């Protein structure tokens, strides 16, 4: 979007840079990173100087914390009347100051399967997309003469929204997208698994015809998929315009660089963090 973005970090930096430097670098590519201690009056004055020429402020702090720093929306709007503000919070009012993270938001809406941790940070990523929409909406409204505005984006609400197919039964166990329909599911192959998504009738009928399935559809598919590897089935499906993909891992290596669909082992790796190797 060709926006000029300045990211304000605390003096110690963003913890993500320590946890996962590669991900941090990818997320912040093209941004100017400035470290400020906003409890320090001089650093706070530096922020105010930047806000004089800023179109949009995006925050991810609890409103009470922003208020203590003099960054509540009423204070900001009075001082910087052209500034729009998108505030990412954990929960909608009246609980916007309650603590939480992606894991606790997902826990509230049924998308966790203990003891496994979620592989996708649904609330964080969906919340980020909502924040972009909110930012564009506020800026467009300002350009149309409606003045600068403020909008909260609650991550828990993003988690709730993404859990709706589960809550409505569509993706629940036994639902059409939860194992109830044999044309939509995961199948074991001679090596690895495939994901089949033949939801539309023409895909489903073509699949059955190509494979010669006429009896117990699920049982026949389970038997047939065992005859080839996942990679072979994917190639077979591509030739027939069928929605089927091999299940992949997420590991990357030099050979796979540039090919995010590289086939990798599905075996779980045991974490060695904190392991004594002496």
Mark where each language-model region is.
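Short, well-ordered alpha-helix to beta-strand connector turns
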Residues: 2, 30-31, 54, 101, ...
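Glycine-rich phosphate-binding loop and adjoining beta1-alpha1-beta2 segment
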Residues: 2-33
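Residue-level detector of anion-binding/catalytic polar loops
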Residues: 4-5, 56-57, 241-243
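Hydrophobic/aromatic beta-strand patches that form the interior of the parallel beta-sheet core
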Residues: 6-8, 34, 58, 84-86, ...
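Acidic, glycine-rich segments within the central catalytic cores of soluble metabolic enzymes
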Residues: 12-13, 24, 94-240, 244-248, ...
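A structured beta-alpha segment of the ubiquitous adenosine-cofactor-binding alpha/beta core
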Residues: 24-78
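N-terminal Rossmann-like NAD(P) cofactor-binding subdomain of oxidoreductases
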Residues: 40, 59-113
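Flexible, small-/acidic-enriched active-site or ligand-binding loops
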Residues: 257-278
């Amino acid at each position: 979007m060709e926006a000029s973005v300045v990211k304000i970090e605390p003096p110690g930096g963003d913890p993500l840079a320590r946890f996962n430097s590669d991900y941090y670098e990818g997320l912040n590519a093209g941004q100017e990173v400035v470290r400020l201690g906003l409890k320090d009056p001089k650093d706070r004055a530096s922020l105010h100087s930047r806000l004089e020429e800023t179109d949009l402020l995006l925050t991810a702090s609890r409103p009470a914390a922003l208020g203590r720093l003099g960054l509540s929306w009423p204070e900001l709007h009075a001082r910087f009347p052209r500034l729009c503000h998108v505030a990412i919070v954990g929960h909608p009012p009246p609980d916007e100051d309650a603590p939480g993270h992606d894991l606790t938001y997902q826990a509230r809406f049924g998308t966790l399967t203990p003891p496994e941790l979620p592989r996708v940070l649904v609330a964080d990523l969906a919340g980020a997309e909502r924040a972009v929409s909110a930012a564009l909406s506020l800026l467009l409204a300002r350009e149309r003469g409606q003045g600068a505005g403020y909008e909260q984006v609650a991550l828990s609400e993003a988690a709730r929204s993404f859990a709706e197919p589960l809550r409505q039964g569509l993706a629940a166990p036994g639902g059409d997208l939860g194992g109830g329909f044999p044309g939509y599911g995961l199948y074991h192959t001679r090596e690895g698994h495939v994901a089949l998504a033949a939801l539309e009738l023409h895909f489903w009928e073509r699949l059955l015809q190509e494979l010669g399935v006429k009896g117990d559809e699920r049982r026949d598919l389970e038997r047939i998929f065992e005859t080839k590897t996942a990679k072979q089935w994917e190639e077979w499906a591509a030739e027939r315009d069928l929605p089927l993909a091999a299940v992949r891992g997420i590991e990357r290596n030099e050979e796979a660089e540039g090919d995010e669909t590289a086939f990798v082992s599905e075996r779980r790796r045991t974490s060695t963090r904190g392991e004594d190797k002496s």
